[in-house]
Amino acid sequence: MQKFVYEYATKVNFGAGAVKEHLAQAVSGYGQNVMLAYGGGSVIDCCKIVAAQAKTEEDLWEMEMTEHKFPTEVLPMGAIVTASGTGAEMNGGAVITNEEKVIKAGMAAAAPRFAILDPEYTLSVPRMQVISGAFDTLSHAMETYFGNSDQDNVSDDVALSIMRNTVVNMRRLLKDINDVQARGNLMWDSAMAENGILKVGRVTDFQAHQMEHQLGAYTDCNHGQGLAVIHPAYYRHIVKDAEEKFQRFGKEVFGVDSAQAGVEALADFIKECGLPTKMGELKSKVEITPEILRNVADTCNVIKCNPRELSRDEIYDLLMECM
């Protein structure tokens, strides 16, 4: 298992020449009764979509995005995780890029019946992708925690523990990328952040994810790295709207006293990890220009349950602050 070759993939494509055509080749002619995803989040998401599309003659994208209907039957599937961070093995959601429409969005698909998480399977994943994936985990926990819910929610306590543990183990990997125990802890952090437990009894704020999804649709940038660029700017815009929660975040995750200090501690941690902090540092298929960021702001989903709903102009402004 340790000898497989890591191949980077940023997205799962939907549209002409992508998932639908591969599905026809992979499923229709062979009569499979189960699927096994072996890889990271993109591989697992692709199999989730294939497992859902295999059981309907309708176009899955149109069915969900236009008709707002969801699959009622899916092909059974399982997952062997070789690159952690997304938590894709723990739920029925899948993030899909439709290149024809320039939309990157979440869809309801198949949920794995089982998942195998062995940190030794991740040892050939390169340092930057491990850290980028772990930041996605941290983002999942943060975006759940900062949703506009009541204080003293038990799910918040669990989220803060996952954030703190993720930071601790990312720092361990910065010292020793082959620390199997740290990789194992991060695999479990990833699973816990997206298995639904943190979302019990609360609403969530995934505005940073919505911005990054559309940024990825236009640029093909790495998901975790795009989040690393966006999060500090976004939190500087909303910190005063959830000051008590940011203060607790700063104290319990980074050991600082004030809400603003918590945001800046997060920004410093991103630099410590060697993650990108500006749009120009992202690996992109095109130059990231103000025009692209305007398109991102105009087309991303706007979340109404974050501490304060943002206007599209404010989203554009904060994205420009990342240039």
For each of these PLM feature ranges, what is it?
Residues M1-Y30, R308:
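N-terminal amphipathic/basic leader segments beginning at the initiator methionine
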Residues V19-H22, S42-C47, G87-M90, A208, ...:
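Short glycine/serine/threonine-rich phosphate/pyrophosphate-binding segments
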Residues S28, Q32, Y38-D59, P71, ...:
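N-terminal small/polar loop signature for handling phosphorylated ligands or for N-terminal nucleophile
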Residues K55-V154:
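A glycine/threonine-rich phosphate-anchoring loop and its flanking beta-alpha core
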Residues L138-M142, R183-E194, H231, L266, ...:
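Short alpha-helical scaffolding segments that buttress acidic/His motifs in well-ordered protein cores
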Residues T144, N148-A265:
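Active-site segments that bind and position negatively charged phosphate/pyrophosphate groups
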Residues F246, V256-M323:
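C-terminal charged capping/lid subdomain of soluble metabolic enzymes
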